[in-house]
Amino acid sequence: MKCPYCSYNESKVVDSRSTEDSISIRRRRECLECGKRYTTYEKIESVPILVIKKNLNREYFDRDKIVNGMIKACQKRPVSRQQIEEIVDEIEKKINNSMITEVKSEYIGELIMEKLKDIDEVSYVRFASVYRQFKDINTFMEEIKKLKDREL
């Protein structure tokens, strides 16, 4: 591991422990040249997941795309970046645990909407309007009615 301070290639591990989510290992290292300490993280490389788009094209799962879409839907709403990251973590974990290598974009969209519905209904409707391509105000009203009926 290359030292970030002096670029020397050898170091020793001073401390090693699992992270809270148990999907990576945090290591404290000490450079054998300059003696400075730094932290590294090791993560198991997962099998790449392909997303099948509506037009049947395939592309690699892109976590940032999901995060950015959710940020837009949650803009000026009481939803923190941390909440968004946690939702995406849960979705990514669910897909990885299913042991499938291809997943439809519709499935991912439904998972996102399911999570948003529970934390902020306005963000949910915003996301759904883009994802489901609402054509007019009536489509919005139908979705809002479903939310209201759910509360009763």
Swiss-Prot record:
For biological process, the GO terms are: negative regulation of DNA-templated transcription
For this protein, the record's PROSITE patterns field holds: ATP_CONE
Designated name of the protein = Transcriptional repressor NrdR
Copy out the cofactor comment: Binds 1 zinc ion.
- What would you give as a GO molecular function for this chain, any one? zinc ion binding
Map the zinc fingers (unnamed) to residue ranges.
3-34
Q: Which family does it belong to?
A: Belongs to the NrdR family.
Q: Please give the cofactor(s) recorded in the UniProt entry for this protein.
A: Zn(2+)
PANTHER family the record matches: TRANSCRIPTIONAL REPRESSOR NRDR
Role noted for this protein = Negatively regulates transcription of bacterial ribonucleotide reductase nrd genes and operons by binding to NrdR-boxes.
Which residues span the membrane?
A: none
What residues does the ATP-cone domain cover?
A: 49-139
Question: Is Cytoplasm one of the keywords?
Answer: no
Alphabetized, the UniProt keywords read: ATP-binding, DNA-binding, Metal-binding, Nucleotide-binding, Repressor, Transcription, Transcription regulation, Zinc, Zinc-finger
Its ancestry begins with: Bacteria, Bacillati, Bacillota, Clostridia, Eubacteriales
